[in-house]
Amino acid sequence: MGGMSGLRRVYLARPRGFCAGVVMAIEAVERWAEALKEKGELVVYHEIVHNRVVVERLQAKGVHFVEDLAEVERLRRERRLADTVVFSAHGHPPAVRRQAAEMGLTVLDATCPLVTKVHTEAKRYAKEGYWILLIGDSADHQEIKGTYGEAPERTILVAVHTHVGKDPRLADPRTVEVPDPERVVVLTQTTLSVDDTLATIAILKKRFPKLVVPSRKDLCYATQNRQEAVKRIAPKVEAFLVLTSPHSSNGMRLLELAQSLVGRAYRLERPEELRPEWLEGVESLGITSAASTPEDLVQGVVDRLKAQNPGLEVVEEGAWETIAFREPKPLSPEEVLKGA
């Protein structure tokens, strides 16, 4: 790699990387893959978190990832599987839970508790006769699929205002229609830009004065904290590196935020993707990472920068989070059906 001799200081954003929901989900997969290895290999429905490195490391431990539970039958013919499936951190529609139970699978539901809270609200408001406007960035995002699946007949997908037109399945907040404007509530994907979500809610509130807006706490604390950390560092740096998968919604929002504040912001997933031209003319650099990015990848980038820039000053900026979530308990097929 070419010289990066102009770089003098790196600011590492705190918090960055794994949030409590991701830690809980990954630890659950690792622990149960080990605990069940005598019975067979573990299956996870959907990527446990949206990070290729995490998925590859778990695959190396014999964990299988499927996008359709029907794939479990095929895998059973080829491999010795444990009769257990882990649901990823993003949440899933009731139909998937029922399917797992009907297949006789024990379920470990590693859905983030903050996502579960939004699911609970969707069910409650639908039962009370409200129309739900669900703000998201893509109808294909697993979290949107899961929340929508709780009340599909009363939910309308709405694009966060910065993504209008990018996915035709998401309505424009400025023109969206609901059958009863007197009974309408807004819910949101938890990993969006805080500022963009609040701006979208403001647009909807103008359109529907009776709009019910649940607590701002529905926006994930980790998403908010990581965005605030980028805002704090931005005035001190000339460029930003964001370690994230392109499939991580919270990571891509960090990248967009850094680009809007600094102008020069670059995405990478692994240290070896670092490119010298990104840092030409840069003396101060900010680094952050998505809530599903392992910390050793960040440190790998820092090590490369130090090797290229002797005397490089590395500043940890901000505070770490202290929140932790309890690991899920296994649910029998009967217990899953009761709650589906």
Curated annotation (Swiss-Prot):
Domain of life of the native organism: Bacteria
Active site annotation, chain numbering: E143 (proton donor)
Reactions catalysed according to its record: isopentenyl diphosphate + 2 oxidized [2Fe-2S]-[ferredoxin] + H2O = (2E)-4-hydroxy-3-methylbut-2-enyl diphosphate + 2 reduced [2Fe-2S]-[ferredoxin] + 2 H(+); dimethylallyl diphosphate + 2 oxidized [2Fe-2S]-[ferredoxin] + H2O = (2E)-4-hydroxy-3-methylbut-2-enyl diphosphate + 2 reduced [2Fe-2S]-[ferredoxin] + 2 H(+)
InterPro entries for the chain: LytB/IspH (IPR003451)
Binding, [4Fe-4S] cluster: C19, C112, C220
One Pfam assignment: LYTB
Binding positions for dimethylallyl diphosphate per the UniProt entry: H50, H90, H141, S248, S249, N250, S292
GO biological processes: dimethylallyl diphosphate biosynthetic process; isopentenyl diphosphate biosynthetic process, methylerythritol 4-phosphate pathway; terpenoid biosynthetic process
Cofactor(s) required for function per UniProt: [4Fe-4S] cluster
Residues at which (2E)-4-hydroxy-3-methylbut-2-enyl diphosphate binds: H50, H90, H141, T190, S248, S249, N250, S292
EC number: 1.17.7.4
Primary role: Catalyzes the conversion of 1-hydroxy-2-methyl-2-(E)-butenyl 4-diphosphate (HMBPP) into a mixture of isopentenyl diphosphate (IPP) and dimethylallyl diphosphate (DMAPP). Acts in the terminal step of the DOXP/MEP pathway for isoprenoid precursor biosynthesis.
Entry's family note: Belongs to the IspH family.
Protein's name in the database: 4-hydroxy-3-methylbut-2-enyl diphosphate reductase
Species the sequence originates in: Thermus thermophilus (strain ATCC 27634 / DSM 579 / HB8)
Gene field: ispH
